[in-house]
């Protein structure tokens, strides 16, 4: 969710605000990502102690969906204001952080469930699954973002701009030349293409989060009460 939004955000800022201003705007949006994640980590223990995790997940899903709805309307229904955009980003990143932490706790609780069933702990297996899922998610995010860019017709323009940045890094092109060329590339992008990009960067996270939430609701049975019973049974052995 959050990482995918950051990946999409780079191209979003290129074509919505122009290449010249995109650098600072991407930086600010990334700061919102870090701030939202840190605040969610700081407040998770307090919030989770006052409600069930499934209730917390439900609230997070609703808030994230609302955030993406606002992002979809940004510049169309809502004013094209940078402060508003960063506030929307903070809301999405904060609740996504809470959601991720709740899922991590739920995954860790399966260690005791596994111990109850099989008589031994498999901490290393759970750790390996988490590590693999992070790497897999990173690869999927890159693939999905590339697919959305291709379908919207922006992929070639995005690659051309990235190529300019590489040339500047090599010293074969000045920043002024890169800026001029990048603006020329960005000017080729039509409003319908940026709309398709916006739809992709909103629809993909919403659909994946909805699917994950439905899967958890149907398949995950270790509630707080069940977990306490599991721990009690293990301790009594």
Residue ranges and their predicted role:
Residues 1-237:
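Membrane-embedded alpha-helical bundles of multi-pass transporters/translocases
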